[in-house]
């Protein structure tokens, strides 16, 4: 079967919230690609990068996806990133641009049709894979998953499902392991995505692992999105990120709004 090109658009948005006193309402900060509105002392910036000729550079949208050639778990470069062909860089970190320490939580959403989520969570069955962040110290590469970014609780993924624009998404989220000082930036949250080598398109249908992929109504391969979202809360008065986020946003907070199910 002939492999075909698939285009993907990876988008990001972020929201921050600050608690500045018992008698005051929550303040928010919103940042996107077109405008910025800031009130209060918490201000975060969602940083997206990719590899360039002179190091990491700002991320460019609308990447073309091909089935990966090689292994994303194989040989790495100086950034701790795979050298496998057709790997798509998506290096995400969060900077605290405010004046106060802040707890940070980040969310990564992937179309449910391309992800083996609830209840099995079998990564080997994902059509579109994503890699956790990495860091390189003294030529040693380590994952930020479970260390700097806490993706699980009680050995379960921080996870829920929601719908955006008529497309179902599996959402994974993680808390940064400590409050981030003013002016500091987290380690990498995620590092990139890649299309499984088994992916193919034939006669107007899509397949992976020898099976047809069941796509949502209205699916458009030229406008696939993996939204990234970050929230932050002033650290003062809280012992950890989970406590801060629950107090600021409430339990089971869906940053994109709408109905969310299969929380764990």
Specify the residue positions occupied by each region the protein language model found.
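Membrane engagement elements in two modes
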Residues: 2-38
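Surface-exposed, hydrophilic segments of mature proteins
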Residues: 26-264
């Amino acid at each position: 079967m002939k492999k075909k090109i698939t285009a993907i658009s990876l988008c990001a948005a972020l929201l921050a919230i600050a608690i500045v006193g018992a008698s005051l309402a929550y303040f928010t900060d919103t940042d996107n690609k077109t405008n910025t509105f800031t009130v209060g002392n918490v201000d975060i910036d969602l940083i997206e990068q990719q590899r360039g000729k002179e190091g990491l550079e700002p991320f460019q949208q609308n990447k073309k996806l091909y089935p990966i050639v090689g292994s994303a778990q194989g040989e790495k470069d100086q950034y701790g990133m795979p050298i496998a062909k057709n790997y798509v860089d998506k290096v995400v970190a969060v900077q605290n641009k405010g004046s106060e320490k802040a707890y940070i939580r980040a969310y990564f959403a992937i179309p449910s049709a391309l992800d083996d989520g609830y209840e099995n969570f079998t990564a080997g069955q994902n059509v579109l894979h994503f890699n956790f962040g990495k860091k390189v110290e003294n030529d040693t590469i380590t994952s930020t998953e479970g260390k700097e970014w806490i993706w699980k609780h009680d050995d379960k993924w921080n996870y829920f499902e929601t719908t955006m624009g008529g497309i179902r998404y599996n959402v994974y989220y993680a808390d940064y392991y400590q409050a981030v000082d003013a002016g500091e930036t987290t380690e990498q949250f995620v590092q990139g995505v890649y299309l499984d080598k088994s992916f193919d398109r034939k006669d107007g249908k899509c397949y992976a692992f020898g099976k047809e992929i069941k796509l949502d109504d209205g699916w458009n391969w030229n406008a696939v999105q993996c939204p990234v979202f970050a929230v932050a809360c002033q650290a003062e008065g809280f012992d950890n990120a989970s406590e801060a986020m629950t107090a600021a946003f409430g339990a089971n907070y869906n940053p994109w709004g709408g109905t969310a199910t299969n929380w764990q």
